[in-house]
């Protein structure tokens, strides 16, 4: 149970994010121009979306509850980021980023 919770966060959620990023990019009107600009950050994140859809849809189904919790948590963080940008809270945004950057000390 704990294992399923953890892999929902560190393995399954990144796949959801990657598929979402690529799908939202492909919906852009000038997607070809955008993709020509794609560099390391996008390519690294988009690489995961090249994974086998059958396999990953089965994994998502198997770990549905934990994955939904992870998605909710991610959406909350995304809203926090969105609000800081919208309200021009640049110092708070920088602190929020620094908090995430601390991961490099763990990994």
Language-model features, listed with the residues they occupy:
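Conserved Rossmann-fold dehydrogenase catalytic segment
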Residues: 1-13, 32-35
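Generic alpha-helical structural context detector
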Residues: 8-11, 15-22, 43, 47
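N-terminal glycine-rich phosphate-binding loop for ADP-containing cofactors
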Residues: 17-32, 59
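Interdomain hinge/lid region at the active-site interface
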Residues: 31-100
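Amphipathic alpha-helical coiled-coil segments
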Residues: 106-107
């Amino acid at each position: 149970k704990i294992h399923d919770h953890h892999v929902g966060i560190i393995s399954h959620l990144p796949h959801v994010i990657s598929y979402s990023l690529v799908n939202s990019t492909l919906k852009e009107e000038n997607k070809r121009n955008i993709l020509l600009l794609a560099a390391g950050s996008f390519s690294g994140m988009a690489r995961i979306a090249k994974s086998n859809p059958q396999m990953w849809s089965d994994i998502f189904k198997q770990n549905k509850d934990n994955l939904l919790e992870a998605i909710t948590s991610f959406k909350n963080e995304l809203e926090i980021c969105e609000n800081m940008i919208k309200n021009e809270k640049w110092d708070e945004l920088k602190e929020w980023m620094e908090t995430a950057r601390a991961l490099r000390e763990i990994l």
